[in-house]
């Protein structure tokens, strides 16, 4: 196989977040509104914009070597691909999306078994059919082209299976979550033949490592300071860190340099304590990656 990796960027709600994640990871991806072929500053890669709903199929067929899609759509299509890693990010938050069974707020539905013989509207038809079939609950599942919440409000169906992060839109429409059917996060998937190719596998693993390290660094900062030798133990005891703080001697001095990594929101608590304990020259700096 040639040393060129064909990669799928998810088009739609994940598009901007994915491009930004690649940027933080060291790749510049440029997307034109009139093209489905983004540019990327990597001579070993080409990119295509593909709907997440179709990504698994194209990866399975080797139209592309690898791509990013929601685990929900990989499951929906039952795509025979390699799941390289999962990455928790979305267009609005850093939490997983949930596919939930939803009914009217005033309905008597308490669980899936109460919907025997009912009509359910959803975009995730295949998964929903399998879910109810595995539980021997007969239902009629209809594909929804959108505005799915309105269908159950208007009485066009008895319940819906819809994706949500916060549940706020569901509540705003007077609906109620009956139960969660599946949790989904973006996953990096690879074609099996591409994964078996040593060069392509190494390239895909490189991408996975850097994307995950950028996500791990979000909302984390580094803190560096100088401290007198007799205060080091007290100072390091108040420092949260991924591992023990790094301590090194300053040249020609009995002072030491201390460095630590922590959550950004912890800094406001830690810095005043450090000052009280005698730390000086405190520097906070952003992190791009944590590996």
Curated annotation (Swiss-Prot):
Coiled coil: none annotated. Feedback inhibited by histidine. Pfam families: HisG, HisG_C. Signal peptide: none annotated. It is an enzyme of class 2 (transferase). Keywords: Amino-acid biosynthesis, ATP-binding, Cytoplasm, Glycosyltransferase, Histidine biosynthesis, Magnesium, Metal-binding, Nucleotide-binding, Transferase. Gene3D superfamilies: 3.30.70.120, Periplasmic binding protein-like II. Its EC number is 2.4.2.17. SUPFAM superfamilies: GlnB-like, Periplasmic binding protein-like II. The keyword Glycoprotein does not apply. Pathway: Amino-acid biosynthesis; L-histidine biosynthesis; L-histidine from 5-phospho-alpha-D-ribose 1-diphosphate: step 1/9. The keyword Nucleotide-binding applies. Its cofactor is Mg(2+). It is found in: Cytoplasm. InterPro entries: ATP-PRT_HisG_long (IPR020621), ATP_PRibTrfase_cat (IPR013820), ATP_PRibTrfase_HisG (IPR001348), HisG_C (IPR013115), N-reg_PII-like_a/b (IPR011322), N-reg_PII/ATP_PRibTrfase_C (IPR015867). One of its GO terms (cellular component) is cytoplasm. It catalyses: 1-(5-phospho-beta-D-ribosyl)-ATP + diphosphate = 5-phospho-alpha-D-ribose 1-diphosphate + ATP. GO terms for molecular function: ATP binding; ATP phosphoribosyltransferase activity; magnesium ion binding. One of its GO terms (biological process) is L-histidine biosynthetic process. Belongs to the ATP phosphoribosyltransferase family. Long subfamily. NCBIfam families: hisG, HisG_C-term. Catalyzes the condensation of ATP and 5-phosphoribose 1-diphosphate to form N'-(5'-phosphoribosyl)-ATP (PR-ATP). Has a crucial role in the pathway because the rate of histidine biosynthesis seems to be controlled primarily by regulation of HisG enzymatic activity. This is ATP phosphoribosyltransferase. It comes from Pelobacter propionicus (strain DSM 2379 / NBRC 103807 / OttBd1). The lineage of its organism: Bacteria, Pseudomonadati, Thermodesulfobacteriota, Desulfuromonadia, Desulfuromonadales. The gene is hisG.
